[in-house]
Amino acid sequence: MKKLFPTQEVGSLLRAPFLKKTITEREILETEYWGRLLGVDGYERLVKALRSGRYVREELYDWASIFGIRFFESAGLDVVWDGEQRRVEMYEYPMRSIEGAVFYGRVKVWDTETYNKAAITSEPRLTRPIYLDEFLFAKKHASRELKVPVTGPYTLADWSFPEYHYAVHREAMSIMERKRL
């Protein structure tokens, strides 16, 4: 029987220490500590690659996802995810898969938080499945049920400059035409 209230995380994890631009011995020791503590299979290979400086950046994101999954599994959560290790930011990540979105630069949201704001300059179209690769990778490495955090369409629209839609509305002749849009 399924649990009435399965446990799951809400939000993101901090980036894995080895995803920093500069990887020092401190980050390597932290990676080794967490790899051992979480029981990450093969973490020794990652530590060796970090020490030698011979690694592929994309592979580090794979490792970060595995560490995130193991973190939540070892915490005993019923439904897990990777803590959004591959995502730049919850808005920018999906917007990079939308044709018609042009990034204008960073805007301040909270005290020190910023995000890269886009404008919708033409009819928006999805260029690829946004979350599929993340899900398939996590599915291969998780031993628990998965959830995929999705940034909803309201947030994507609200956080974007609607230039295309303003232009379409300006071109409409009557109030009735505008209502149909």
Which positions does each model-derived feature cover?
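Domain-level signal for soluble alpha/beta catalytic cores
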Residues: 1-181
